[in-house]
Amino acid sequence: MHLTVLDAPTEWSRFAEGSVERRMLLALGDLLGTPLRPKPLMLPDGSRVEVEGIDRACRVLVQLVGNQGAYKPAYRNKVMADMFKLLWLRESVPTAERAILLVSELIVQALGGWVARAATDLGIEIHVYDGSTVAPLRPLSRPDVKRP
């Protein structure tokens, strides 16, 4: 199944000027050297889904988890849902080459255990927004395990 990328009604869709989501996309676009904007996509049956960031060539797909404030365990579910969405979108947009999950520093907590490893194994890049710039997630340290 292939999705069709549609023109958005406005350049930034639901991301208001000054919103954390807009700042996140601008910072990631600066890092990658390509503008990223939210876009609606149409499925063959006419239903729609939005990707929170995509470049003009439709090669880079981005989902954002930009929550601020106190950490809530439910944020881990949002991370996993967005990873699942990115996998599907990468397979459904014929030109897609990269799938990036961009998270705020707060959300890094949700990437503990197997979640970050699964993202890496599935080819999903994780980047972290620190409030002004974006950098790839540093590999999580692994405890030394001595095997007999």
Which residues make up each language-model segment?
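Alpha-helical scaffolding within the catalytic cores
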Residues: 47-49, 84
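Catalytic cores of nucleic-acid endonucleases
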Residues: 65-121
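Residue-level detector of flexible, active-site-proximal loop/helix-junction positions
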Residues: 42-43, 68, 133-135
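Regulatory, intrinsically disordered low-complexity regions in eukaryotic nuclear proteins
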Residues: 37-38, 99-100, 127-129
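Short, well-ordered coil/turn elements that cap or connect secondary structure elements
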Residues: 31, 56, 121-123
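Active-site beta-strand-loop-beta-strand hairpin of nuclease catalytic cores
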Residues: 51-64
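Acidic-basic catalytic patches of nuclease active cores, encompassing PD-(D/E)XK
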Residues: 1-43
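Non-catalytic C-terminal interaction segments of nucleic acid-processing enzymes
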Residues: 12, 84-87, 106-148
